[in-house]
Amino acid sequence: MPIAIHTGDTAWPSGLLKYSHPLTVDEAAVAFPDVTFVIAHCGCPWFADAAEVACKNANVCIDLSGLVEGNPKPLMLLERQRGFLRQLHTWLNYLGNYEKIMYGSDWPLVNIPLYIWMISHVVPECYHEDVFYNNAVRIYSKIGKLLEKCGG
């Protein structure tokens, strides 16, 4: 069973960032090589560290949930977040293994159609089916079994 670990910024002033940094997942991944770990939120804002931890450890994947919040207009989102999205794109390419990357929304904090649109502009189109569906079904194998039962 995979273990998803919250990484990245915390919503609470009393939360300690050292415990939500993606490098903490490296320690767990090395100690438990038979467990699959998912770095939630791609370690935002520490994309480089999250990508390196996933690159180094065969048992670590990344989800792209909760990277933006709210309901901005698409062009406004691209304009305001251009540097952020460019950085995310750079580090996903550094990882170079789109089989380790999954879509995630962090709903209800985001507008789902807008979020899908944003992620589709960061992930190369040839990997969309894997990132938006196949990887989650493979990594969270119980989901695939449930979908089969439902005919999906």
Residue ranges and their predicted role:
Residues H89-T90, Y94-M102, P108-G152:
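Mid-to-C-terminal alpha-helical segments outside catalytic/metal-binding sites
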Residues L67-E69, W107-V110:
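Short Gly/Pro-enriched loop/turn and capping motifs at secondary-structure junctions
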Residues M1-M102:
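Catalytic pocket-lining loop regions of alpha/beta-barrel enzymes
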